[in-house]
A protein has these predicted regions:
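Conserved active-site alpha-helix within GNAT-family acetyltransferase domains
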Residues: 121-139, 250, 274-291
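Conserved donor-binding loop and adjoining core beta-sheet/short helix segment
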Residues: 23-30, 40, 46, 53-115, ...
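Conserved GNAT acetyl-CoA-binding A-motif
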Residues: 111-119, 231, 260-271
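Conserved beta-strand-loop-alpha-helix junction that forms the acyl-donor binding cleft
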Residues: 117-123, 241, 269-280, 295-305
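Acyl-donor-binding surface of acyltransferase catalytic domains
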Residues: 2-17, 75-79, 87-159, 296
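A conserved beta-strand-loop-helix scaffold within acyl/acetyltransferase catalytic domains
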Residues: 57, 86-87, 188-237
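Short amphipathic alpha-helix that is part of the acyltransferase structural core
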Residues: 3-52, 151-189, 306
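Conserved acetyl-CoA-binding loop-helix of GNAT-fold acetyltransferases
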Residues: 97-106, 235-241, 245-261, 279-284
């Protein structure tokens, strides 16, 4: 079997099929030969899919750094209708109900999914098919997808803003771990200390984190999670409470955005709809809402703990 983008399939590779429902859909694991077609598919909605596209550009289609496996769903016309990364963080972009159902059905076979994240309507459709046999939901957050393509006004210099290095790890790691715990309910320093430290050190070596450190104290940080020519995805933005209300957080963020726009068409990020302070900060920095995402955190299966 050969698909329109050059991906080949055989009986061993076909993981899920809707042929019995006359939909003719086929779900296949993705390999390096599909990279160009997948990136083209994802680029049709660049800010919604920047995380997956960035992982592929950074790590390739198959890599332990992805912490999961990429799959593609083809319809009966051999057209790609969906791409998913299924694993620790499960992300997907689907253009049909059949693709969502295929991804959700396959995801039930995983024991260690920590997060499911996509646009809210897609996540709820995914959970409809996943709930019978999947891991239980720990909790979820609705998030605003913010985006800007304009460099914000920068009133003042920020000579103190710089790229973080591994020498900053001891300052950043506890802060980032607490952010993860507050968001997911899991403290990564308790559940996977060495892995968490190793992954964040890799990010620092990739020059993906901006910081302001003064007097041995972290004042501000922002992480570049994914980068493509079309979009850059920011996450992990943290502001020391002792600079709140000074305008310096806005100044730091504005300079980060300005620098990143030199190599990407737009900057995007997610923030919880209930985080009023963050929403106001991003709006002041020139970001505007492009939709609602949902992040669903799952509890581990009971048998995975034994």
């Amino acid at each position: 079997m050969r698909f329109a983008n050059g991906q080949t399939g055989n009986t061993r590779q076909i993981l899920h099929s809707e042929a019995s429902n006359n939909l003719g859909g086929v779900l296949l694991q993705m390999f390096a030969e599909s990279e160009e077609a997948v990136l083209e598919f994802l680029s049709q909605r660049p800010i919604q899919t920047v995380a997956m596209a960035g992982f592929i550009r950074d790590n390739g289609m198959v890599s332990r750094h992805n912490r999961g496996t990429f799959y593609g769903y083809w319809n009966s016309k051999q057209e790609l209708e969906g791409v998913a990364l299924i694993g620790h963080a499960t992300l997907f972009e689907a253009r049909s109900v059949a693709a969502v159902k295929a991804f959700a059905t396959l995801a039930k076979k995983w024991n260690d999914i920590h997060l499911i994240m996509a646009e809210q309507s897609s996540v709820r459709e995914f959970l409809h098919y996943y709930s019978d046999g999947g891991q239980s939901v720990r909790h979820s957050h609705q998030q605003i997808l913010f985006e800007t393509g304009r460099s914000p006004r920068q009133h003042g210099e920020v000579h103190y803003l710089r790229r973080a290095t591994v020498n900053d790890l001891h300052l950043i790691l506890p802060v980032h771990a607490e952010m993860c715990r507050a968001e997911s309910g899991v403290d990564p320093l308790a559940s996977d200390s060495s892995g968490f430290r190793r992954r964040y050190a890799r990010r620092l070596k990739q020059n993906r984190t901006y910081v302001w450190v003064e007097g041995g104290e972290l004042k501000f940080k922002a992480d570049v999670i994914s980068h493509t020519p079309e979009a850059t995805y920011l996450e992990g933005i943290w502001i020391n409470p002792n600079i709140s209300g000074t305008g310096k957080a806005l100044l730091c963020l504005s300079h980060v955005v300005g620098r990143l726009l030199n190599r990407s068409q737009s900057i995007c990020l997610l923030t919880n709809v209930t985080n009023g302070n963050a929403v106001r900060l991003y709006e002041k920095a020139g970001f505007s809402s492009q939709g609602i995402f949902e992040s669903v955190f799952l509890a581990p299966r009971a048998n995975a703990l034994n």
